[in-house]
Amino acid sequence: MNRLQLYFRLVRLNKPIGILLLLWPTLWALWLASDGKPDWTLLAIFTLGTILMRSAGCAINDYADRDFDKYVQRTVDRPVTSGKIQPREALLVALALALLSFALIWPLNTLTKQLSIAAVIIAGTYPYFKRFFAIPQAYLGIAFGFGIPMGFAAVQNTVPAAAWWLLVANVFWAVAYDTEYAMVDREDDLKLGMKTSAITFGRHDVAAVMFCYAVTLGLIFIVGWQYGLRTWFAAGMLIATGCAIYHYTLIRARERAGCFAAFRHNNWLGAAIFGGVVLDYLIR
């Protein structure tokens, strides 16, 4: 495997689900902030920025977890923990990607740039929260959802209350899907003394996931309704609700394969909401 392929794996470009889980909330925000008519330049900036920052986050995560990943079945072959990439290289990759991302938003307003600094700090510190915070997935939800206030700031030069409520919804969504993800690694994480929501929720993990989905979908529906979205948005939300119910059938047995499949399927939940938002603005 050549160096380029190793870097490709380091930043998880071979696993785009993480990019999509960041991108959908950002797109919801851009469409709502612009009344369904987003600027194509802004769309390009935020889409590329999402890819770059998620990639930087993966590099930082592998650096921070290099002494733990070797003991987890799913992560044992990651480039840093396996010694194929040096920790210093991972840090340099993360720094380069973060700088590129910041360069992208340099032409935007001051508020957006200020929020981007907060986003970088949150993304960079997330891996360490897993060591002492009982539900680190909540912090992940802030990191994965910071494109929401940034999107509103870029379009409106302000961040309305609705944007913060969407961010709260994204926190609950992240707790839901990343708990499914954590259920895959629960036994390994227990041995390592790591803290995850799957461990914290214990035997109530499935109920907690479904509760988080309910809060997520409820908050998003309320925000969309306040923005005048109706029929097609409601249809998208109905499909998203169906996705959440389907996830219950996948995780209720707590089997690794089912939990991982549920995690990956969240792409379609986010896409359904986005599709409903776009169609509602188009068909009026």
Curated annotation (Swiss-Prot):
Topology in the lipid bilayer: Multi-pass membrane protein
Enzyme Commission no: 2.5.1.39
TM spans (from-to): 16-36, 40-60, 91-111, 132-152, 157-177, 206-226, 231-251, 259-279
NCBIfam families registered for this protein in UniProt: ubiA_proteo
Keywords: Cell inner membrane, Cell membrane, Magnesium, Membrane, Transferase, Transmembrane, Transmembrane helix, Ubiquinone biosynthesis
GO biological process, one term: ubiquinone biosynthetic process
Domain of life: Bacteria
Annotated metabolic or biological route of this protein: Cofactor biosynthesis; ubiquinone biosynthesis
Reaction equations catalysed: all-trans-octaprenyl diphosphate + 4-hydroxybenzoate = 4-hydroxy-3-(all-trans-octaprenyl)benzoate + diphosphate
Record's subcellular location: Cell inner membrane
Native source species: Herminiimonas arsenicoxydans
Organism lineage string: Bacteria, Pseudomonadati, Pseudomonadota, Betaproteobacteria, Burkholderiales
InterPro entries: HB_polyprenyltransferase-like, Prenyltransferase, UbiA_prenyltransferase, UbiA_prenylTrfase_CS, UbiA_sf
Any Gene Ontology CC annotation: plasma membrane
Function statement: Catalyzes the prenylation of para-hydroxybenzoate (PHB) with an all-trans polyprenyl group. Mediates the second step in the final reaction sequence of ubiquinone-8 (UQ-8) biosynthesis, which is the condensation of the polyisoprenoid side chain with PHB, generating the first membrane-bound Q intermediate 3-octaprenyl-4-hydroxybenzoate.
UniProt name for this protein: 4-hydroxybenzoate octaprenyltransferase
Family indicated by similarity: Belongs to the UbiA prenyltransferase family.
GO molecular function: 4-hydroxybenzoate polyprenyltransferase activity
